């Protein structure tokens, strides 16, 4: 009897958790992407980002998949453990659009015919990073 109850309980937990954390489908969905470059490489990272990644994001805005993309950097320094160099904020059309499969590979081939050079520069862009993390954002109503 206890085993049966435990099995039923375990099958219900994922359903309740997914309902609790599911973003609202029709509203814009915001994700912040943080980049922490190795010391002395932030400018190189920015140059490679603008050359190879930003055009992909801009194209997706033009396609309507994303509503807006922008980059911020801190005005002042922080402690090393909390340091980040760039934050890219992407506003997706909705949460479904953010997670549904998207053929970014064909877009890369369209924008960057020299795939060998593109791959090499993208590898470099990530090699000079100390950290990268993504944070989906949920607005809090203060009223």
Predicted regions and their residues:
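Short, solvent-exposed mixed-charge patches
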Residues: 142-143
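A cross-kingdom feature marking solvent-exposed beta-strand/loop segments within repeated
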Residues: 73-77
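Acidic/histidine-rich, surface-exposed loop or edge segments in extracytoplasmic proteins
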Residues: 25-40
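An amphipathic, aromatic/His-enriched active-site/gating alpha helix that lines ligand/cofactor pockets
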Residues: 59-67, 81-83, 89-138
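Boundary of Sec targeting at the N-terminus
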Residues: 19-20
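Short amphipathic alpha-helical segments
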Residues: 43-68
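Sec-dependent N-terminal signal peptides
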Residues: 3-15
